Amino acid sequence: MELSDDINQCANLVKQGDHDRYRIIMTLEPKLRSDLFVLMAANIEISRAPWISKENLISEIRLRWWLDAIEEIASKQSVRRHFVTSPLEKILNKSQTKLIKENILARSWDINLEPHLSENELFRYIDATSGNIWAVAAELLGGSQKIGRLLGNAIGVIQYCKASNELIL
């Protein structure tokens, strides 16, 4: 399978899994879209991992799979074949893989669904998940991680409120 096939699969995953982000990416110039489709597809796969099973162990294994894959990318080892990891390897630098690893580790909270103990803990979770993804996205587009993180945190608060409402109702 060619890398362009992987990127097309990533774009389709984003279109189906997060139509709002898909529409945001489609407003960019075509040459800027590929990297963001790959990054956002990774985010979808990682964010779904805690929810794939009611069995916590299965969800933990899935998150571990992603953590191992990102560690392979960071260490420049041979990366496991997956339609997201193969192109992701081509776009992430070492500092960006660190942010993705923090995202994965934060997602373990989703497995147990324990309440955040404080407002600060909640905002650390949002920063590690949404803030980190948008920080990497901004950098991939040639912008500042700081601006991307601010945008990501704002989006993360909105998404958290939306998800909390859906979980409550």
Residue ranges: model-predicted function:
Residues 1-169:
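Acidic catalytic motifs of isoprenoid enzymes
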